[in-house]
Amino acid sequence: MPETERVKTLRLDVQDWPGHLPGQHVDIRLTSEDGYQAQRSYSIASPPGSALELTVELVDDGEVSPYLTEEIRIGDRFELRGPVGGYFVWEPSRGGPLLLVAGGSGVVPFRAMLLQLAAAGDPVQATVLHSSRGWDDVIYRDELSALANDHIKVLHTLTRSQPEGWDGYARRVDKEMLAEIGPGPDAQPQIYVCGPTPFVEAVATALVDLGHEPATVRTERFGPTGG
């Protein structure tokens, strides 16, 4: 299912899948006819109790993402390991408030968290700040809008281009923006930051500068190349 021009969501049928938690990921390995192997990690996009979904962004000159976004066909088989990870996991039992800050496809694990939060009907307050280049680049744009309610606040910042009449943020995430959207340190939020390495490092530093304890800021990052 296409999310943007360069991003697709895949639903996978995995034999003996043990189930997963929001914030975990899987490793996918492809093997060519000559034996060459390439492996990449992808965040799980679906909530627990549902079919495994991955949202993949096409990376130019990538070794795995072109196959997953452009070549894969129903019935294809490949190696998958997972679910992997526990550090970046969030479950409703952990409470809130939640602050989720995403850069580009870093929003993928947050979809799983928000869908679980919405399904649980838990009144945990969640604030989502999603940074994208332009409005057409916003992954899960309609779905995030549909999830927004009294308990889930969704905000966007568009760093390169904005549609006519745009009245939201139009710059990179900075300390002032994070202070405006809250929650602040006094609320002791659980904070998750995901995106490209420079984005994650800048946001994490800004959050600590605002007074958030470093131990409360969980980060997951990916490099500018690969795929």
Regions found by a protein language model. Name each.
Residues M1-D76, S132-G134, T157-S161:
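Ferredoxin-reductase
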Residues P83-R94:
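A short, basic/flexible loop-to-alpha-helix module at the beginning of a structural domain
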Residues P97-V107:
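Short, glycine-rich nucleotide/cofactor-binding loops
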Residues S46-L52, P92-G95, D122:
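Ligand-binding loop in jelly-roll beta-barrel domains
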Residues V124-G227:
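Reductase modules of NAD(P)H-dependent flavoproteins
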Residues Q116-A126:
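Conserved S-adenosyl-L-methionine
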